[in-house]
């Protein structure tokens, strides 16, 4: 059956040639069904059982779980099937044609992160899955680049509890064991419009927002003082005021003002805790002006993530790579997979190539990535 599997570079080429863009804008958003079908067929050829899971609340998106072996525990290798949209004017190559040049493989998703599945499939050619002592799972998720709906839904619904997981995001093969989360909110204040010549007849939303911002900045200072995680370059939760808009004319009392902000929490801080801190900070404004201030999510929140530094997964991977685990500031699906089992983020390619025109993966990653995948499968599924 394994001889039906195409060569490594042809698998890679087919993955890149199959569009699977995720976007909040419906006109740009694409189903990942064709890519899931490709992966499902290849893993079936390798003797895996394959389950395709529709993801609710998405535009025809799917997860795929390929599994082999019996019993509890085992290893989960995970990644997302979607890419970001691309700016055609900034690409000098066809994003959907895998192009090799000067030691680099170019194409949309080469690094972030369709290519990881090509590495898994290629490594499995030489693995007799019938002899595994523990199960091996391959998870391909949907919509990581927007809502992370695929990983969220899988984590909420699966009964699987592997011993550990590796998510193959581009980390330049440097293992990552922790990252911050991301919460984004819209603060909206509804005032009362009126002519600027008679301020008493209106409620100026900009003035109320000025008051609210003062309390939010106090929260920012408090977060910096109360929470600390030395391993991060910025070792405290950050709070950013990113966008504000209010009013429509200089001679009108502003009736509405909206502020967009984000918080990047440290691992261990819960979403409920952060929501409570924000609501407490804004309580004086809400109490003084009942019904005029609302807080809404801009995007589904992502908690911080941490794999215990003394876990066997960390020790094994650090020994195999000869490198210590790191912490990073960007977000992945790890917080959701971590609810199932200890998880590391580790994969070929550089995060600096993610979301960039002329995205590429350096060919120097091919051999060590294949070896690493083979080694972790041997360690966690054969021992």
Swiss-Prot record:
Catalytic residue list: 82, 144
Gene3D superfamilies: 3.30.70.360, Zn peptidases
Binding site for Zn(2+) 1: 80, 112, 169
Localization in the cell: Cytoplasm
Ligand binding (Zn(2+) 2): 112, 145, 355
Cofactor: Zn(2+); Co(2+); glutathione
Reactions that this protein is recorded to catalyse: N(2)-acetyl-L-ornithine + H2O = L-ornithine + acetate
Annotated signal peptide: none
InterPro entries cross-referenced by the UniProt entry: AcOrn-deacetyl, ArgE/DapE_CS, Bact_exopeptidase_dim_dom, Peptidase_M20, Peptidase_M20_dimer, Peptidase_M20A
Disulfide-linked positions: none
Pathway: Amino-acid biosynthesis; L-arginine biosynthesis; L-ornithine from N(2)-acetyl-L-ornithine (linear): step 1/1
GO biological process, one term: L-arginine biosynthetic process
Keywords of the record: Amino-acid biosynthesis, Arginine biosynthesis, Cobalt, Cytoplasm, Hydrolase, Metal-binding, Zinc
Listed GO CC annotations: cytoplasm
Cofactor binding note: Binds 2 Zn(2+) or Co(2+) ions per subunit.
Family matches, as Pfam families: M20_dimer, Peptidase_M20
Chief place of localization: cytoplasm
Gene Ontology MF annotations: acetylornithine deacetylase activity; zinc ion binding
EC number: 3.5.1.16
Subunit structure: Homodimer.
Function, in words: Catalyzes the hydrolysis of the amide bond of N(2)-acetylated L-amino acids. Cleaves the acetyl group from N-acetyl-L-ornithine to form L-ornithine, an intermediate in L-arginine biosynthesis pathway, and a branchpoint in the synthesis of polyamines.
UniProt xrefs under HAMAP family: ArgE
Family the entry assigns: Belongs to the peptidase M20A family. ArgE subfamily.
Name of the protein this chain belongs to: Acetylornithine deacetylase
Record organism: Shigella dysenteriae serotype 1 (strain Sd197)
The organism's taxonomic lineage, starting at the top: Bacteria, Pseudomonadati, Pseudomonadota, Gammaproteobacteria, Enterobacterales
Annotated gene: argE
